[in-house]
């Protein structure tokens, strides 16, 4: 956290001096200052919080001659307000009273108890249980970006280095909750998340490396494979320093770094993730998406792994193939294995996040009770897995071994139904600690003592209505109505006067009060001490709990895949060494799911792409299903690469490195880009980066400009994809002239989506057939959309005129006719090419001089 210069406190009241001293350490963060039963905010913080949280802003008194603006919330309502702030991208500092008001001279001592930021949340009430929460830091060195990300709840700490132009795509894949970056930057991240500037020295490599080595208790980072990753280590150091500051100390559950290799995942750029609607629809809704369809997971850990897996399909096939084998094993004996696993998973709590809170020492009593019940279920979860032939399931069986010492501790120490907070008591189980049991016994005997004393005092005083009672404000007292005050014994001392009664205390009752209240206070203090000792005892078990949590998530994911495959009749995909994407009876998983809900049937289609058939040119009417067909092919490929069965009768896939999509039309007003500019930008990315192992989907290229321009661009892009990229491509178009290219390129095949016209009406068949379409049915689709009949009639008349005129004198030349050859574009001079590749801002003086000599050498 960045600190401001300390303010002049001499003219302020003692309480405001204390507040301002704390606030000076957190100038850019809302500070919640505990005062009795409320958290108060002052001055600018109060104005901001009142606006964001819709609470009353008031002014009370003055300090240093300035009116004190303030607002507040009850202490027991803090969490909902924090949740609202975090959703708005705000951070908060929680300042608690740590001194005793009864013994304090001046303001009660206060200290920062925790700092809540969008990327460092661990409280279950503040975070989505089905989504990982990543804190991310990024910095650059020359043309390389170092990115570090931390999941504080699970302890995952991951590094990656990518070219700087890939920062937006990487952030879109990770979807962090908060991004840290050097304050000297003007970032353009391309994602809308909370951003936190940090001093540039936070990202200094040497200090970052030392900090990381201290955290992991190692001499170097070579053991993690990270020693040479300077930008990533710099980012990781800034990240760790920030996390330690927010958690007020060390993070014992962070035990190492994972280096993510660029290219380990099937490449999905921003446009592809959006167009395939993996976890969010094009309209920003959570369903219907691939995630909402597949999320059969029983545990929140499984749901989070599913979301992560959808955005991280693996390029290598070993892990997906192992998952296919595990799903197959679950399906072969689903009643005994798959179904039993899902039953056993029910009731298992979020062990991953509870373990994180144990490590951070902010686990609540009910967290430990949930952990106890979940660990006790592990043997029942393991039992069905014991004889599975699938290697992955056998591995999970080993990882799910019950940590019995931890379980025994939780059973002995934590009450069956503990209180919500340690401060409320009732957390430690009876019989765990003799001293606590004795203190509780004193406290529990209060009721019997009061009943006995009430009977004795009634007999002694002759007052039948006399009561001996207790409340938290006035303690123990004897209550006598005004009509009977003349009968009270001499040793009664008045404690409080009410409208209809007087309350008294006696020496005997006072002595008991001191003893009872002391026992209660000591009992709560003892429980707090014991609870902290239990957290200490559980700390060494945290790595084991993290392993168990990962195994449960993996098993839940696999069981969910098996459930989807069984319910929807999906097949096990096959991986092949040669170039191909062969799908028989493929369906779009999400569209089929929606149609099934409406008791309708999805029309299955085949797709064959191979070495000698690399491009399918798709024609057909609007609404005929071209975009759905293209997306289903991409989704089937992606599902295979995450280890899931696929919606098809059969599927064989060769090697893939990336999936590109150019589908749909939308402008980007925020960046000032028109629909056509967005289309061309996405097409440019494909042409620059697609390889012969990429799957490319391109829909309606060139429609955002004039007919001639659009057709010329579509032709040139199509030719480039065939000749240069040589990708496996699905290319949908309304330019029927492009279909003639099948005579020029043997690897291009024409297919179309069929339709039938009857009495000026159109019926879409949604079936993919070989060969080109013969017309687009645009006017019929316009009629279906509700265009006025008169307009449709006029359009038909105009179309006939165009067709008659074209038969005599074609409106447009044949773009594919062989005309006079165009003059060849001059080849750029080598000096120009090399000069264009130089980034002067990234060169050292020595490197710039070397580059200049190299250019001069080329001129010779």
Swiss-Prot record:
Coiled coil: none annotated. ATP binds at residues 620-627. Transmembrane segments: none annotated. One of its GO terms (cellular component) is cytosol. Keywords: ATP-binding, DNA damage, DNA repair, DNA-binding, Nucleotide-binding. Gene3D superfamilies: 1.10.1420.10, 6.10.140.430, DNA repair protein MutS, domain I, MutS, connector domain, P-loop containing nucleotide triphosphate hydrolases. GO terms for molecular function: ATP binding; ATP-dependent DNA damage sensor activity; damaged DNA binding; mismatched DNA binding. The keyword rRNA-binding does not apply. GO terms for biological process: mismatch repair. It comes from the Bacteria. CDD domains: ABC_MutS1. This protein is involved in the repair of mismatches in DNA. It is possible that it carries out the mismatch recognition step. This protein has a weak ATPase activity. Belongs to the DNA mismatch repair MutS family. PANTHER family: DNA MISMATCH REPAIR PROTEIN MSH1, MITOCHONDRIAL, DNA MISMATCH REPAIR PROTEIN MUTS FAMILY MEMBER. This is DNA mismatch repair protein MutS.
């Amino acid at each position: 956290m960045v600190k401001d210069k300390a303010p002049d406190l001499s003219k302020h009241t003692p309480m405001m001096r204390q507040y301002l001293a704390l606030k000076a350490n957190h100038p850019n963060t809302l500070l919640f200052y505990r005062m009795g039963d409320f958290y108060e905010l002052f001055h600018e913080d109060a104005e901001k919080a009142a606006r964001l949280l819709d609470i009353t802003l008031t002014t009370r008194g003055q300090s240093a001659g300035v009116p004190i603006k303030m607002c507040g919330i009850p202490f027991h309502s803090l969490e909902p307000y924090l949740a609202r702030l975090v959703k708005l991208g705000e951070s908060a500092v929680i300042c608690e009273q740590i001194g005793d008001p009864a013994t304090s001279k001046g303001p009660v001592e206060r200290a920062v108890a925790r700092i809540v930021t969008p990327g460092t949340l661990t409280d279950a009430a503040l975070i989505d249980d089905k989504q990982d929460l990543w804190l991310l830091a990024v910095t650059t060195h020359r043309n390389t970006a170092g990115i570090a990300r931390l999941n504080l709840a699970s302890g995952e700490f991951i590094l990656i280095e990518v070219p700087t132009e890939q920062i937006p795509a990487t952030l879109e894949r990770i979807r962090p909750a908060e991004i840290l970056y050097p304050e000297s930057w003007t970032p353009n991240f391309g994602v809308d998340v909370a951003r936190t500037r940090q001093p540039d020295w936070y990202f200094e490599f040497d200090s970052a490396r030392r900090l990381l080595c201290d955290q992991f208790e190692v001499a170097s980072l070579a053991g993690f494979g990270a020693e040479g990753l300077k930008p990533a280590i710099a980012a990781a150091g800034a990240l760790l320093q920030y996390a330690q500051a927010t958690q007020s100390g060390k993070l014992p559950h962070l035990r190492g770094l994972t280096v993510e290799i660029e290219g380990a995942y099937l490449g999905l750029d921003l446009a592809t993730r959006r167009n395939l609607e993996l976890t969010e629809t094009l309209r920003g809704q959570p369903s219907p998406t691939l995630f909402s369809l597949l999320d059969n997971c029983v545990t929140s850990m499984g749901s989070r792994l599913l979301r992560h897996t959808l955005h991280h399909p693996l390029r290598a096939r070993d892990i997906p193939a192992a998952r296919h084998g595990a799903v197959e094993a679950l399906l072969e004996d689903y009643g005994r294995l798959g179904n039993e696993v899902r039953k056993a998973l029910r009731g298992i709590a979020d062990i991953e996040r509870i373990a994180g809170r144990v490590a951070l020492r902010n686990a609540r009593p009910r967290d430990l009770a949930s952990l106890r019940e979940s660990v006790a279920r592990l043997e029942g979860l393991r039992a069905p897995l014991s004889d599975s032939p699938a290697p992955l399931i056998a591995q999970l069986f080993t990882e799910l071994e019950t940590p019995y010492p931890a379980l025994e501790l939780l059973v002995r120490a934590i009450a069956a139904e503990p209180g919500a907070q340690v401060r409320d008591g009732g957390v430690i189980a009876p019989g765990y600690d003799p001293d606590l049991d004795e203190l509780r016994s004193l406290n529990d005997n209060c009721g019997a003592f009061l009943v006995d004393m009430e009977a004795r005092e009634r007999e002694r005083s002759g007052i039948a209505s006399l009561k001996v009672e207790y409340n938290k404000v006035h303690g123990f007292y004897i209550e006598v109505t005004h009509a009977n005050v003349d009968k009270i014994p001499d040793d009664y001392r008045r404690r409080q006067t009410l409208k209809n009664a007087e309350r008294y205390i006696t020496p005997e009752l006072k002595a008991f009060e001191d003893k009872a209240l002391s026992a209660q206070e000591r009992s709560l203090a003892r429980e707090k001490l014991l609870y902290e000792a239990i957290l200490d005892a559980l700390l060494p078990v945290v790595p084991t709990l993290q392993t168990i949590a990962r195994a449960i998530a993996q098993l839940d994911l696999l069981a969910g895949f098996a459930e989807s495959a069984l319910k929807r009749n999906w097949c096990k995909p096959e991986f092949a060494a040669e170039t191909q994407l062969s799908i028989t009876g493929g369906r779009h998983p999400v569209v089929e799911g929606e149609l099934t809900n409406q008791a309708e049937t999805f029309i299955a289609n085949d797709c064959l792409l191979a070495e000698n058939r690399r491009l399918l040119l798709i024609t057909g009417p609007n609404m005929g299903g071209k975009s759905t067909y293209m997306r289903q092919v991409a989704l089937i490929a992606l599902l295979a690469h995450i280890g899931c069965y696929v919606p098809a009768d059969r599927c064989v896939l060769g090697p893939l490195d990336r999936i590109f999509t150019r589908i749909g039309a939308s402008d980007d007003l925020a960046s000032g880009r028109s629909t056509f500019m967005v289309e061309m930008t996405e097409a440019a990315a494909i042409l620059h980066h697609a390889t012969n192992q990429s799957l490319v989907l391109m829909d309606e290229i060139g429609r955002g400009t004039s007919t001639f321009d659009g057709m010329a661009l579509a032709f040139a892009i199509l030719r480039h994809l065939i000749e240069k990229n040589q990708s496996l491509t699905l290319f949908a178009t309304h330019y029927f002239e492009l279909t003639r290219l099948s005579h020029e390129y043997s690897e291009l095949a024409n297919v179309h989506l069929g339709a039938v016209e009857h009495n000026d009406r159109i019926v879409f068949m949604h079936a993919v057939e070989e060969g080109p379409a013969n017309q687009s049915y645009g006017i019929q689709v316009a009629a279906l959309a509700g265009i006025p009949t008169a307009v449709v009639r006029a359009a038909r008349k105009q179309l006939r005129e165009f067709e008659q005129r074209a038969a005599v004198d074609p409106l447009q030349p044949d773009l594919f006719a062989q005309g006079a050859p165009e003059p060849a574009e001059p080849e750029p001079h080598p000096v120009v090419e090399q000069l264009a590749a130089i980034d002067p801002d990234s060169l050292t003086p020595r490197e710039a001089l070397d580059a200049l000599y190299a250019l001069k050498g080329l001129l010779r």
